[in-house]
From Swiss-Prot:
Record-linked CDD domains: PRTases_typeI (cd06223)
Enzymatic reactions: AMP + diphosphate = 5-phospho-alpha-D-ribose 1-diphosphate + adenine
PROSITE patterns linked: PUR_PYR_PR_TRANSFER
Family: Belongs to the purine/pyrimidine phosphoribosyltransferase family.
SUPFAM superfamilies, A to Z: PRTase-like
Compartments, record wording: Cytoplasm
Listed pathway(s): Purine metabolism; AMP biosynthesis via salvage pathway; AMP from adenine: step 1/1
Organism of this sequence: Gluconobacter oxydans (strain 621H) (Gluconobacter suboxydans)
Lineage: Bacteria, Pseudomonadati, Pseudomonadota, Alphaproteobacteria, Acetobacterales
InterPro entries in the record: Ade_phspho_trans, PRibTrfase_dom, PRTase-like, UPRTase/APRTase
Name of the featured protein: Adenine phosphoribosyltransferase
Major place of residence: cytoplasm
EC number: 2.4.2.7
GO CC entries: cytoplasm
Stretches that traverse the bilayer: none
Length: 179
C-alpha cells in the first residue's frame, strides 16, 4: 500500500465555499466537490492515511455524518476497524451517550456500547473543525467507553475559531482556513 501523492495537488481548489449556508452569515465549506473528484479524493485520503498510520490506530471513529465519509475509507485503506458516533436514536442495540454544550444549546452523541474494547487505540475523524465542541465531546465519549484516543483528524480546520485549543490529543488538519 502506497501513501505517495500521485501528483502535487492543492486540495483547496476542490472545496466549494457557499456563503449564507445553512443560514445567513455562515460560510459553508462544501467537501462534496472534493469527494466526487477521484484524483483529489485519492490524494486527500493518501495524505490523511500517512499521518493517521503513524498513530497506529486499532479503530477509526467517524462523527455523524460527514466524518463517516472520511473514516470509513481510511479504515479500509489502513486495515483497521471503523465505528460511528451518532445522534440519539440512530444506532441499534445498547448505546453509551454524552451530552455536550454548544454555543446556543446542547447536543448529544452516542456510540454502541460494544464498539470499542477497553484500551483500543482510536483516531476520531470529522470533516471540519470549527469551535471544537463536537470533536472534544467525541474524544470524551470515546474515553468513556475505554478507548485510548491517540489523535484526531479533519479535512478542514477553521483556525481563527481556535477549536484546536479544546483538544488534548494531536490534531491533523488536511487544509486550514483563516477567516
Amino acid at each position: 500500500m502506497s501513501f505517495q501523492d500521485p501528483q502535487p495537488l492543492d486540495l483547496k481548489n476542490y472545496i466549494r465555499e457557499i456563503p449564507d449556508f445553512p443560514k445567513r452569515g455562515i460560510l459553508f465549506y462544501d467537501i462534496s466537490t472534493l469527494i466526487r473528484s477521484p484524483d483529489a479524493w485519492q490524494v486527500a485520503t493518501a495524505r490523511l492515511a500517512r499521518v493517521i498510520a503513524a498513530w497506529q490506530p486499532d479503530i477509526l471513529a467517524g462523527i455523524e455524518s460527514r466524518g463517516f465519509l472520511t473514516a470509513a475509507p481510511l479504515a479500509l485503506r489502513l486495515g483497521c476497524g471503523f465505528t460511528m458516533l451518532r445522534k440519539p436514536g440512530k444506532l441499534p442495540g445498547k448505546t453509551i451517550s454524552l451530552k455536550y454544550g454548544l454555543e446556543y444549546g446542547e447536543d448529544e452523541l452516542h456510540i454502541q456500547a460494544d464498539a470499542i474494547k477497553p484500551g483500543q487505540r482510536v483516531v476520531v475523524l470529522d470533516d471540519l473543525l470549527a469551535t471544537g465542541g463536537t470533536l472534544a465531546a467525541s474524544i470524551d465519549l470515546l474515553r468513556k467507553v475505554g478507548a485510548e484516543v491517540v489523535g484526531a483528524s479533519v479535512l478542514i480546520e477553521l483556525a481563527d475559531l481556535k477549536g484546536r485549543e479544546k483538544l488534548d490529543v494531536p490534531l491533523n488538519a488536511l487544509m486550514t482556513y483563516d477567516e
